Amino acid sequence: MVFASRGGKTKELLPIVDICKAKGVHIITVTENLESPLAQAADVVIKQYVNRETDKWNAQGTTSTTALCMIFHALQAALIEYTGYRAEQFALIHPGGAVGERLNKKAL
């Protein structure tokens, strides 16, 4: 399970962490706060650093969610390489649209 929280203290996520731990689910947390409950509960922590959000109160997750997207895209690319995930496998779960059409042509 992957959790993302800039401060790592999002109360809505903490009960889910407990359930995951009880079920033996591995936890990855992306956060700025390495001392936070989410970071402390994680098997793997990815430190995210955002100097400032774009809104005038520095409160809305604008810059941090953009950075999070980049982290997730990098993780996806790394996992595809690490696991040897193939285009044929992706085509099975994404059969439609231009991407599905292209993937299914390659799979033939």
Language model regions located:
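Internal, active-site/partner-interface "lid" segment
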Residues: 40, 54, 78-108
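Glycine-rich phosphate-binding loops that contact phosphosugars or nucleotide phosphates
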Residues: 1-83
